[in-house]
């Protein structure tokens, strides 16, 4: 890439970067997340709906744990680092108050049969069923990694400097659609205004209207806060396709 091959610089806060990572629980080396497909398969974490590749983030943008983003400041593209994070700076300590007993009748009312290990959502919080005894169900609403010291192996693959590529990276991060081709997304920059026309696949996304709105807001917010733009427009246009009539075409 011309100068990009010989010019290296250190990562600063506010930089847009791509990185690979594998996250493990320190006490037993159990892998709980990774961007590598082969590692995910070996760990029994593989998800066919997930695309395994370096993820884009803004350093200091709270896209990953703050301790990870702080630790990669000063690295260069191509650098690797092992980052140890204690529970206080990861997902916090376990809170006994978040372990609750819920009457069985609440589950029956919703047509659910609770079993240990099942995940449920209540009042916006996700919990895991620990035990089912008689008329009571014990549910743990702590984050699954609460109270755990963690290790992250991080590989920085790229520092993104081009404005259009930065914008596309935030679309990749926040508007994850498996079949969307980011290269078909059109970015038009007009002064301090960014106009984004997403790939046609995004127009027929099965996400709820609220999810789509939140995703677009997060993209716009990251652009406002980390780039020199004041307004972000998302353009949805539907164009009539001009089909060639072969029968009337002149030979």
Question: Model-found features: residue ranges?
Answer:
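Extracytoplasmic beta-sandwich strand-turn segments characteristic of Greek-key/jelly-roll folds
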Residues: 42-62
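Short, non-transmembrane amphipathic alpha-helical segments
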Residues: 205-231
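Short Gly/aromatic-enriched secondary-structure transition segments
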Residues: 30-46, 98
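A short amphipathic beta-strand at an alpha->beta junction
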Residues: 224-246
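FKBP-type peptidyl-prolyl cis-trans isomerase
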Residues: 13-31, 68, 75-108, 114-161
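Short edge beta-strands and adjacent turn/loop segments
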Residues: 178-197
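Short, small-residue-biased leader/transition segments that mark boundaries at the very start
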Residues: 1-7
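Short amphipathic alpha-helix segments
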Residues: 163-179
